[in-house]
Amino acid sequence: STAVRDAQQRSGVAGPINALTIDVEDYFQVSALAWYIRRDEWDTRECRVEANVDRILGLLSEHGTQATFFTLGWVAERYPEMVRRIVAQGHELASHGHGHERASDLDAAAFRADVTRAKAILEDTAGVPVHG
């Protein structure tokens, strides 16, 4: 990832220092709750993602650590400023799909459409290319 390469250059260490990734999704979007919280109910739930990401950003800043944030397109649409803060603080932005679909539940065309949609939303929101 870009974050790892940047850390290597700053430290002068040839190998990876760490590879820290963070999934940016809300509690109600995990597949374990899919039977209890339908997608059409997501917008009715209290979102905690922004407060949690801001806390993580603070901790990473405090420790001089960079990470890759795998972010849902759904989240980026609702919290564009948060996505821009992630990038502004030097972290790598990557796609976690749009609606947290399980890849095993999608055919190739649906998977491609989901990933393409999320990538476009993330790039348009953050103004940086998304490679992951």
Placement of each model-derived feature along the sequence:
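Catalytic alpha-helical scaffold of carbohydrate-active enzymes acting on polysaccharides/glycoconjugates
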Residues: 1-132
